[in-house]
Amino acid sequence: MNNIIHNDAPTPWGIYFQDGASPVYDGIVELHDQVLFYLLIVLVGVSWILFSTILRFRGSGIVHKYHNHSTTIEFVWTVSPALLLIAIAFPSFKLLYLMDEVIDPSITIKAIGHQWYWSYEYSDYTDKEGQSIEFDSYMLPTEDLEEGQLRQLEVDNRVLVPVNTPLRFIITATDVLHDFAVPSLGIKVDASPGRLNQVSTYVQREGVYYGQCSELCGVLHSSMPIVIEAVSLEKFLSWLDNQ
């Protein structure tokens, strides 16, 4: 049996994406790779033309009479970028539409940004006292971390969600602008006071996914981590029963 280790948190000197756990995230990575491929082609092509021209005409004093004007060249360098932008725009717009679409979520979780912590509310469920399940989530101080926990990324209360279930997050704030961002799930949404923003996701595998507030919100901006733990439906229902 093969054990696969997923990268669901920032790593030192990391230069690429974290491992994905949602369809939207996979689409983001695929679009990035496609655009990067196009950019490399442009870089190589333009660099080749530039350096070949420099090497050919350096110091010779020769001026080609057709280099002052060429309808063919102007047509090529006008149409080629237009076609390239169209090739990038269509998959980009498609992905943006899919990211904004919320289709019949099974669970809705409200995330509220504060200076400097997050609070969460499971509006669809109630605790033993008949109140909506809600809690605050603060960053764990360094001295309280256990072995294997991540500094400035671990919290005292994680958001628990079931895998393979349509989820919706409703995001807002009470004071200043914040930003709810979980890279491995492809989530990044502004948390604005007096405004409700929403985003849907579908977690494909169990794991612990780390994020942070991604909007400069004050002196303790870096102390607003987000931790989403995806578990099986059975474990999630058991957690609900214990609330």
From Swiss-Prot:
Membrane topology, Mitochondrial matrix segments: 56-74
Keyword Magnesium included in the entry's annotation: yes
Membrane topology according to the record: Multi-pass membrane protein
Signal peptide: none
One Pfam family named in its UniProt record: COX2_TM
Cofactor: Cu cation
Biological-process GO terms, alphabetical: ATP synthesis coupled electron transport
Principal subcellular localisation of the protein: mitochondrion
Swiss-Prot/TrEMBL keywords: Copper, Electron transport, Magnesium, Membrane, Metal-binding, Mitochondrion, Mitochondrion inner membrane, Respiratory chain, Translocase, Transmembrane, Transmembrane helix, Transport
Annotated binding of Cu cation A2, by residue: 213, 215, 217, 221
GO cellular component: mitochondrial inner membrane
EC category: translocase
Residues involved in Cu cation A1 binding: 178, 213, 217, 224
Self-association and partners: Component of the cytochrome c oxidase (complex IV, CIV), a multisubunit enzyme composed of a catalytic core of 3 subunits and several supernumerary subunits. The complex exists as a monomer or a dimer and forms supercomplexes (SCs) in the inner mitochondrial membrane with ubiquinol-cytochrome c oxidoreductase (cytochrome b-c1 complex, complex III, CIII).
Protein name, UniProt field: Cytochrome c oxidase subunit 2
Organism: Pneumocystis carinii
